[in-house]
């Protein structure tokens, strides 16, 4: 490492068969680390590999290793980074800003991500490593009430327009300010951008239309921190 290179924080990353990061929660942690000015040392892990790392302590990702300190869960990681490195750019400038990020996440997940999950759950299955596919099918079909993945995604093209319309409050907010954090991106932006990065990692039926106003924010967000969200393995978000 050169004398001027930023110190890195290790991030255990959930990946597809092609090595592309899939988890929106890992993406949140990745953005949080970069926002604090640290380099990300990503360690790729498959679904079935999670229990094989770190002595089997964790059953889900992200996990960071910051000089021997292990932190699990994207919100806990953000809080840890702000608490441990208060001299670096904050993820939550105030308690109120954190509360608003929680509010946004509580709206965005059931309104946008959960419906998109039902559109892309079969894509998720098809793009994971071969050894992960049985687990993905069994766990997702159980979560979805026993429905076959093929049946869940059927008719998704007809459902996508309603999901796009449900994003309208996000478009309205971003028409008045460059970021959800105002003049600078904050954790709410990372929650939203990470959802679109998840969709870009697996979709075979793009969620957005080419003229969607959200692309101004999405593209600027993907370009942050030296193009953190730019990965040639990602799939288009619009046809």
Predicted regions and their residues:
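GST-like domain detector, emphasizing the conserved glutathione-binding G-site
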Residues: 1-134
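Acidic carboxylate-rich catalytic motifs and surrounding loops in phosphoryl-/glycosyl-chemistry enzymes
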Residues: 44-49, 185, 234-236
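Non-transmembrane alpha-helical segments in soluble domains
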Residues: 78, 82, 102-105, 160, ...
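GST-like fold's C-terminal all-alpha helical module
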Residues: 110-216
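Long, positively charged, glycine-interspersed low-complexity recognition regions
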Residues: 199-239
């Amino acid at each position: 490492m050169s004398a001027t290179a930023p110190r890195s924080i290790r991030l255990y990353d959930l990946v597809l068969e092609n090595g592309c990061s899939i988890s929106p929660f890992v993406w949140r942690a990745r953005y949080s680390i970069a926002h604090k000015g640290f380099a990300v040392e990503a360690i790729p892990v498959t679904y079935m590999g999670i229990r094989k790392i770190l002595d089997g302590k964790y059953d889900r990702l992200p996990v960071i290793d910051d000089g021997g300190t292990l932190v699990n869960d994207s919100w806990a990681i953000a809080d840890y980074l702000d608490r441990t490195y208060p001299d670096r750019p904050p993820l939550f400038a105030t308690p109120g800003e954190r509360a608003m990020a929680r509010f946004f996440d509580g709206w965005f997940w059931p309104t946008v991500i959960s419906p998109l999950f039902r559109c892309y759950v079969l894509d998720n299955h098809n793009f994971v490593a071969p050894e992960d596919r049985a687990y993905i099918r069994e766990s997702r079909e159980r979560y979805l009430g026993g429905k076959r993945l093929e049946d869940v995604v059927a008719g998704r093209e007809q459902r996508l327009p309603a999901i796009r319309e449900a994003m309208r409050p996000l478009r309205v907010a971003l028409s008045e300010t460059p970021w959800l954090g105002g003049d600078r991106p904050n954790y709410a932006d990372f929650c939203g951008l990470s959802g679109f990065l998840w969709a870009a990692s697996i979709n075979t039926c793009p969620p957005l239309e080419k003229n969607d106003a959200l692309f101004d924010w999405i593209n600027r967000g993907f370009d942050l921190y030296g193009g953190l969200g730019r990965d040639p393995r990602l799939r288009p978000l619009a046809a």
